């Protein structure tokens, strides 16, 4: 076989090797359409460590955010096992999530589950509150056996604004589900005094933004809202 006849097969083999090399075109994740990939930062690529090709993609809602990437209420969801956390020590964590300034970090267990065992075990040499009250009852029969505890929760409830109380109840019910974005959620948007900000929005679902509406500082909807797509501005007379 002459060298001229060998040239076309060699060129074809070279082209196949270049296409399969790491420097070639990025492989697309199954389930991410071409239109969806255009909105995914960095493209939709397969993992190099042999993981599931679809790990970085949602079925029909665009690419999932990887660990360390920015996230928020209006961004695609974090990958499984990750949660969108606001910046540490941020004074307005929910506002940071609304602005997309969170980070996808490993999911953490609720802190309450870790604190309860420590609180239930008194240190050696210390008397439990019920034992102290029992001794006081024996010395002073006219006193009450109910432990006297400061009503810190009640004081906080009276000092909190209506939006902050609403927010606390939502967080208690949803706990970590608030940041996962598995479904459309409503998390109250409060100002630093605990009242409602003028613009309230539901969370996004995939790359589709949730609806927004306008309220006064007590959370009452104002005329002309919601608009259904979150594009209108709210009047300046309400809290925000």
Curated annotation (Swiss-Prot):
Signal peptide: 1-27
SUBUNIT field: Interacts (via C-terminal domain) with PHB2.
PANTHER family associated with the record: INSULIN-LIKE GROWTH FACTOR BINDING PROTEIN (PTHR11551), INSULIN-LIKE GROWTH FACTOR-BINDING PROTEIN 6 (PTHR11551:SF14)
PROSITE patterns for this protein: IGFBP_N_2, THYROGLOBULIN_1_1, THYROGLOBULIN_1_2
Domain of life: Eukaryota
Disulfide bonds: 29-32, 40-44, 57-63, 71-84, 78-104, 163-190, 201-212, 214-234
Location in or out of the cell: Secreted
Entry keywords, A to Z: Disulfide bond, Glycoprotein, Growth factor binding, Secreted, Signal
InterPro entries, per database record: Growth_fac_rcpt_cys_sf, IGFBP-6, IGFBP-like, IGFBP_1-6_chordata, Thyroglobulin_1, Thyroglobulin_1_sf
Known glycosylation sites: 126, 144-146, 152
Region of interest called Disordered, as start-end residue ranges on this chain: 109-160, 217-240
Main location: secreted
Organism placement in taxonomy: Eukaryota, Metazoa, Chordata, Craniata, Vertebrata
Annotated ranges, domain IGFBP N-terminal: 28-107
Protein name per its UniProtKB record: Insulin-like growth factor-binding protein 6
Function statement: IGF-binding proteins prolong the half-life of the IGFs and have been shown to either inhibit or stimulate the growth promoting effects of the IGFs on cell culture. They alter the interaction of IGFs with their cell surface receptors. Activates the MAPK signaling pathway and induces cell migration.
Gene Ontology MF terms in the entry: fibronectin binding; identical protein binding; insulin-like growth factor I binding; insulin-like growth factor II binding; signaling receptor binding
Species this chain originates from: Homo sapiens
Sequence ranges assigned to domain Thyroglobulin type-1 in this UniProt record: 160-234
